[in-house]
């Protein structure tokens, strides 16, 4: 994240996702962004199916560990895995609009922008937009393939 071109390229995914929703070439209700380069850290199980939730919120992975018995975090990375997002065609434009505004504001202040941390800040400011699941980076796909147990 010390390379300005890398920061711009990573954050450009949201505009590409927005363009996909606008064109809706396959006439679908839900869209997903998946970074295939994430395989260096994310486990890609065979025959795994990602499905959207019943509601229209953005389905995302909150990078943290949660102890259900103690109802406390073992650690909280305060990041959303931006490499895998699933959302409804009506919700994605809201996500991308908020991302654009937040990204441009931080950029104008001269900040180095980590998209995973920016998404977490967006989650804190707009919890109604997200349906998040607590997990580690390695298990993102497996976790988002199962019904969610911790939500906002």
What are these regions (language model features)?
Residues 17, 48-50, 119-120:
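Short amphipathic alpha-helical segments and helix-helix/interface helices
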Residues 23-26, 30, 38-71:
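Conserved donor-nucleotide/metal-binding helix-loop-beta segment in metal-dependent transferases, i.e.
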Residues 38-40, 74-152:
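Catalytic core and acceptor-binding pocket of nucleotide-sugar-dependent glycosyltransferases
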């Amino acid at each position: 994240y010390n390379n300005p071109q890398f920061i711009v390229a990573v954050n450009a995914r949201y505009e590409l996702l927005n363009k996909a929703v606008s064109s809706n070439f396959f006439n679908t209700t839900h869209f997903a962004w998946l970074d295939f380069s994430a395989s260096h850290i994310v486990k890609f199980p065979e025959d795994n199916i990602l499905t959207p939730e019943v509601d229209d919120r953005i389905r995302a992975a909150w990078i943290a560990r949660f102890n259900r018995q103690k109802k406390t975090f073992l650690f909280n990375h305060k990041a959303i895995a931006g490499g895998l997002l699933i959302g409804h065609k009506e919700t994605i434009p809201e996500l991308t609009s908020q991302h654009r505004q937040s990204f441009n504001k931080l950029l104008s202040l001269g900040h180095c922008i980590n998209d995973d941390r920016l998404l977490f800040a967006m989650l804190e400011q707009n919890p109604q937009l997200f349906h998040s699941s607590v997990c580690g980076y390695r298990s993102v796909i497996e976790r988002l393939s199962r019904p969610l147990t911790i939500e906002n």
